[in-house]
Regions:
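Serine endopeptidase catalytic core focused on the charge-relay Asp
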Residues: 99, 103-104
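Compositionally biased, intrinsically disordered low-complexity segments
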Residues: 29-32, 68, 107
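Conserved short loop/helix modules at catalytic or binding sites
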Residues: 19, 42-90
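GIY-YIG nuclease catalytic motif and its immediate N-terminal context
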Residues: 1-46, 90-91
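Short secondary-structure capping/junction motifs at helix and strand boundaries
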Residues: 108-113
Length: 113
């Protein structure tokens, strides 16, 4: 999986996604503009690239669901919900943990189970 995720990461960087996603923060996966998953990462670009790889491989139930949705013509997308404000590693983890919970409660995404 590592090579596929690395390839997706470098493709995303080459195509101009780094300024938006290469940060610590809270991101979401959308199907037809509906938030279906909320996650946190110290580097959202790397995490989103890993999600792309997993969707291609269908390695877990949530990724098989997303792959099937795409196969049926639904649009899949990613977006940033929140950028971390803290700079220290421990503070970022605490901040993102709290914010992730807030966004999960706010959106009740079906794939956060």
């Amino acid at each position: 999986m590592g090579n596929y995720a690395d390839n997706a990461y470098y493709w995303m960087k080459r195509n101009g996604h780094a300024p938006k996603y290469e940060h610590a923060g809270i991101y979401c996966i959308k199907v037809d503009d509906k938030i279906v998953y909320v996650g946190k990462s110290r580097n959202m670009l790397r995490r989103i690239a890993a999600h792309y790889a997993h969707i291609q491989m269908g390695t877990e139930t949530k990724y098989r669901i997303l792959s099937e949705a795409r196969r049926k013509g639904h649009s899949l997308g990613f977006d940033v919900l929140y950028y971390a404000k803290s700079k220290r590693y421990a503070d970022i983890n605490t901040e993102l943990g709290e914010k992730e919970g807030e966004y999960i409660r706010m959106y009740s995404p079906i794939l956060n189970t």
